[in-house]
Structures are given as structure tokens and as C-alpha cells.
């Protein structure tokens, strides 16, 4: 069973993602801040990370950069899932090391398809 880390400061979004992911057989971890997400990524070494951009303190772009630059976690695929939908946000997310960028609200089928794509690629 693949382990997925959700990093999102919205309890509502985290709950929604947890429901979807557990329904599809994934083990789910979660963090509500970018800093906690980086720490949990380093300690739990999830198979994939879903991360929001807008969070207090360390934002999703900064956390993505830290995770993808660290030797221990650089192999973990990161998918940004955010309400920020400008092309510049997508480009910046990819430059920080994200493998993909989905815009909220994301449909369940689309989310699962992208997750499978990156888990199977590893």
C-alpha cells in the first residue's frame, strides 16, 4: 500500500483528500503547515506528496523546494494541488521541483489518475 502525505492548512481539504485516498487503498499522512510537511517527509518518507501552496509560514513552493533539494527526500514525487491557477504559479511550482500541478477543486478521478501515474513511474 502506497503512503501519501497531504500538506494542506485547510482541515476541510485535508479531510476530503483523506476520504478519497483511503477509499482507493492508500495510507495517508497529513501535515497542516509547510514546515511540518518537510519534517514529516523526512521522517516518514512517503511514496508521494500532495501539497497546497498557500499556507502560513513556509508555503508550498518553499516546502517543495526543501523536499526536492534534500538528498533523503529528493526522489519523492510532489504534486501541487492549489487554488492558484495562473500559468506563472504552475511554472514556479515545477521550478521548485514539483512533478505536477493540479488546480482545486480537483475531480476525484483526475486526482487518482495523476497519483497512479507518478507512483507507477517510480
Question: Where are the regions a protein language model picked out?
Answer:
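Active-site beta3 strand of CheY-like receiver
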Residues: 44-50
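Short hydrophobic/Thr-rich beta-strand motif most characteristic of the beta2 strand and flanking loop
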Residues: 25-32, 40
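C-terminal output helix
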Residues: 106-115
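Charged docking surfaces used in two-component/phosphorelay signaling
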Residues: 15-23
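Short, glycine/charged-rich "phosphate-handling" switch motifs in NTP-dependent
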Residues: 99
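Receiver (REC) domain active-site loop signature in two-component systems and cognate sites
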Residues: 55
Amino acid at each position: 500500500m502506497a503512503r501519501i502525505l497531504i500538506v494542506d492548512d485547510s482541515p476541510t481539504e485535508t479531510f476530503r483528500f483523506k476520504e478519497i485516498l483511503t477509499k482507493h487503498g492508500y495510507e495517508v499522512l497529513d501535515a497542516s503547515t509547510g514546515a511540518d510537511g518537510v519534517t514529516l517527509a523526512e521522517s516518514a518518507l512517503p511514496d508521494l506528496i500532495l501539497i497546497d501552496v498557500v499556507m502560513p509560514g513556509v508555503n508550498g513552493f518553499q516546502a517543495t523546494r526543501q523536499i526536492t533539494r534534500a538528498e533523503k527526500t529528493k526522489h519523492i514525487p510532489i504534486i501541487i494541488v492549489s487554488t492558484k491557477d495562473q500559468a506563472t504559479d504552475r511554472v514556479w511550482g515545477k521550478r521548485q521541483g514539483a512533478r505536477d500541478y493540479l488546480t482545486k477543486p480537483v475531480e476525484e478521478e483526475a486526482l487518482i489518475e495523476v497519483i497512479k501515474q507518478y507512483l507507477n513511474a517510480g
